[in-house]
Amino acid sequence: EDGTVLFGTWNCLYSYANLQLKKEEGLVPPISVICTSGNETFALGPNGIWQHSENGWKQLNYPIARSVRCAETDGKGSLWVGTDAGIYFCKNGKSTLYQNTNELISAYVRAIGFAPNGNCWVGTMGGVAVRNDEKLQKKITPAEGLSNSFVTCIVPSPDGTMWIGTELGIVRFDREYKPSLRFSRRWLMNDKVNDIAFDNEGNAWVATNGGVSQIKRNTMTLAEKEKDFYHQLMYRHIREPWTCGSVYLEIPGDTASWRHEDDDNDGEYTGGYLAMESFRYATTKSEDAHTKARKAFDFLRQLQTVTRTAGFFARSIVPPTWNKLHDGNRTYTPQQIADELVKDPRYKPVENRWRLSADGK
């Protein structure tokens, strides 16, 4: 709480405060796990458990397995230690081991976290066991919404939601154990989550194998949310001659590198956009909505008129300067045509899929 940072290393425990790095005395390295709550701070490793006090570090005589993987304290004198042999509940000089399947999901404990109601969530190979001091309360496995059986960390958020890091993203569980998944590059630099921490504003900082991701807490009204999404729609997805289409990223994960692309569903997407603007006009009588709905309708009509036929519709319209197209014009060798016919006897090669409009635009 005083801003001191502790580092457990191969040869000692170090503290960093006031721009000074200090080697802590009285511990036997290596130190692999550090946990703190309120005024209680513990350091653990294969050679024992130490607790910090005003007089320095004192070793605690708790008989536990040497394979320490994680630890948490409830701030009331109790210490939970996860090992490869199960989880130890340490208090008043005594340690109790829980390792059976009626106590945990498995004995390979990798993460511990305390829920607001005081229950201890134990992440193991196989899922999460929710315990109180005495018995198992609930098991959380992929059947209950966990994204992966390999749990890496468990951290309560400021609002009481339990965030469970796995090797396949994050699953958040509310007080009713309802899950919600945070997964893929939409949320994370990499799906293998190593740790989670929350700042004073409730934002989550997630350490992954691909870097650190920030999941920000943002409160908004429904009207504000609509305004944000509508801005993104108009800025990114509307292109001339008023097509509502998809985009792609030139650099994966870099949203600033977006570019327009053609899609054979451009008519369908623009039709959905036309319906949206029509509903907006019907509700608000906004002239802006009326104008944009008319432009969308004109594009849908142009899909037919641009072909200069009685009933043939184009799938999309793009500028002639585009050089990156889906299903671009190409030629086929006799061997390629034969290969396609073997796969699909009804196959018909079309070499000239894209045709220049009469106005050349």
Mark where each language-model region is:
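Carboxylate-rich, polar loop motifs that coordinate divalent cations or form catalytic acidic clusters
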Residues: 1-224
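A structural signal for alpha-helical segments
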Residues: 188, 261, 284-291
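Intrinsically disordered, compositionally biased low-complexity regions
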Residues: 217, 227-229, 259
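Long, well-ordered core segments of solenoidal/helical folds
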Residues: 224-254, 292-308
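Alpha-helical packing segments of well-folded alpha/beta enzyme cores
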Residues: 229, 269-272, 276, 296
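Solvent-exposed loop and edge beta-strand segments that line ligand/cofactor-binding
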Residues: 255-270, 361
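Well-ordered alpha-helical scaffold segments within catalytic/enzyme domains
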Residues: 271-287
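Extended ligand-binding groove/face enriched in aromatic
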Residues: 288-361
